[in-house]
Amino acid sequence: MRIPNIFLSYLRQVAVDGTLSSCSGVKSRKPVIAFGFDDSQDSLVDENDEKILEPFGYYRHLLKGKSARTVLMHCFNAFLGLPEDWVLGVTKAIEDLHNASLLIDDIEDESALRRGSPAAHMKYGIALTMNAGNLVYFTVLQDIYDLGMRTGGTQVANAMAHIYTEEMIELHRGQGIEIWWRDQRSPPSVDQYIHMLEQKTGGLLRLGVRLLQCHPGGNNRADLSAIALRIGVYYQLRDDYINLMSTSYHDERGFAEDITEGKYTFPMLHSLKRSPDSGLREILDLKPADIALKKKAIAIMQETGSLIATRNLLGAVKNDLSGLVAEQRGDDYAMSAGLERFLEKLYIAE
């Protein structure tokens, strides 16, 4: 069963007898072929999807491999004990959503590269790339609704759709305020920045956990949302740090691209607060591509102790995570073994 679609229901009724009746029972994504065309042309839908989703397919191929999100969902399932097909369904939804969001993010950030290759909008154009990303947002919603219907009926499907909508709203609020800060050249406070990370980066992992826990069976009493949220925050703070410091990151995205994109990241905000007259604000407002200017900005952040402060914050989030994991596992160390191995690989060496 699929989400009822008023427009398709209307077309179906008009195509059959030219009248309008109540909308119900629409179970197909495929458009109704009417007005002299027969249903044998349904294959055109698949052909069109292949064309209009080329930017999405490009990123799915570019980013292929067992992602951290896939591994993490299985680590969480050690606490929940849910069927494998359910976990795979949720994981696919999160992966598709993540890749779709990257299509939009790279446009909004004006990024030229993604993992050392041209960003999708540089290859396919802004219009098609944006449409592909938005389309996948809705196909993911359809997929999780279908997964819920197959597993637990309308109640589970509706709960999953509600959670998805709720978290997508938060994700867009987080992305939106980050863009506003960037475009208005209005740096937020550190607390405002961390809240944005909770909405944006942490929200995607929290969505995955909440969808997993919609299953009617398993140990759904485990409170894993707080762990997922902090992992997301750690990811972004780590990204803030390595964007400025890691050579391998530079090869994939370009040197200190956060500076060129005009973003405000944690080390930048810490430095601006510590030394408002250091000249960093003026450099950041230029959104420079010039390597010398970017190196000067990084040198200022080093002088204000902001890169050390970033590492210290990463350490604090790490300690917080360790406490939360221990709280959820109790004495069952085997339950959290996979998650703890995952986290050890994620953490920056002290």
UniProtKB/Swiss-Prot annotation:
Signal peptide: none annotated. The keyword Chloroplast does not apply. GO terms for biological process: antibiotic biosynthetic process; terpenoid biosynthetic process. Pfam families: polyprenyl_synt. Keywords: Antibiotic biosynthesis, Isoprene biosynthesis, Magnesium, Metal-binding, Transferase. Dimethylallyl diphosphate binds at R114, K200, T201, Q236, N243, K263. Mg(2+) 1 binds at D105, D109. The keyword Transferase applies. Pathway: Secondary metabolite biosynthesis; terpenoid biosynthesis. Binds 2 Mg(2+) ions per subunit. Mg(2+) 2 binds at D105, D109. Its cofactor is Mg(2+). Its EC number is 2.5.1.-, 2.5.1.1, 2.5.1.29, 2.5.1.10. It catalyses: isopentenyl diphosphate + dimethylallyl diphosphate = (2E)-geranyl diphosphate + diphosphate; isopentenyl diphosphate + (2E)-geranyl diphosphate = (2E,6E)-farnesyl diphosphate + diphosphate; isopentenyl diphosphate + (2E,6E)-farnesyl diphosphate = (2E,6E,10E)-geranylgeranyl diphosphate + diphosphate. Belongs to the FPP/GGPP synthase family. This is Geranylgeranyl pyrophosphate synthase. The lineage of its organism: Eukaryota, Fungi, Dikarya, Basidiomycota, Agaricomycotina. The gene is ple4.
